Design a protein with these regions (language model features):
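Catalytic domains of carbohydrate-active enzymes, especially glycoside hydrolases
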Residues: 3-14
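Extended active-site neighborhood of metal-dependent phosphoesterases/phosphodiesterases
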Residues: 5, 20-141, 154-178, 184-203
Length: 203
């Protein structure tokens, strides 16, 4: 809230895991109040929120996270992955929100803990990302996912290697400006040799 007062955000990009632990069971789950409504209650945060699913949401009812769009005025999640274009004083920005858990074998293969991950069509999403980025003509193109492609972390290397093999070639092909993610609970800004993409962890 205090930061909101200082910078006056236009909207919030929520890179997953609003609900930690086991996600939520429904749109009426009390965790919506304890994890979201009561925490982010400052007047400056009563603006549009554009979220994506994190791995913890995948432990619960992922459809309920999308359906909360019909409950909360500020929660705006039209699909598991989606895109919007913004124009501010002649500068255009395209943000592409993606669903990274289904792109990682660790989650796809653990059908007991993450039952919805294996049900998602990975090839369809990757083709959609490629198509959106092919058509993007904005001044800035930013992709938002929950999991990092590159990061210094003790978390499972396979998470990043799967994204390096499946997602990163598409981002590099289209020369996106930035990939923003969460998941590892710290801040990192990474540049890789041979790529002009800024890989930012902000969680």
């Amino acid at each position: 809230g205090k930061m909101g007062e200082e910078i006056g955000p236009e909207f919030v990009v929520a890179a997953g895991d609003i609900h930690h632990f086991e996600g939520v069971r429904s749109v009426n789950d009390p965790l919506w109040m304890t994890n979201y409504e009561l925490i982010y209650s400052h007047p400056e945060l009563m603006i549009d929120w554009y979220p994506i699913l994190g791995n913890h949401e995948y432990r619960g009812n992922t459809q309920a996270v999308l359906d909360y769009t019909n409950v909360s005025r500020r929660w705006s999640m039209p699909a598991r992955y989606y895109t919007k274009s913004f124009n501010e004083e002649g500068v255009t920005v395209r943000i592409v929100w993606i669903d990274t858990a289904p792109l990682i074998d660790k989650y796809r293969n653990d059908t007991q803990t993450y039952p919805d991950a294996c049900k998602q069509d990975m090839k369809k999403q990757l083709a959609w990302i490629d198509d959106v980025l092919t058509k993007a003509k904005e001044d800035w193109v930013i992709v938002v996912g929950h999991h990092p492609i590159y990061a210094e972390t003790s978390k499972d290397d396979s998470e990043r290697s799967d994204l390096q093999n499946r997602l990163d070639p598409i981002l590099r092909k289209h020369k996106v400006d930035m990939y923003v993610c969460g998941h590892i609970h710290n801040f990192q800004h990474i540049r890789m040799n041979g790529s002009n993409i800024d890989y930012v962890v902000n969680s």
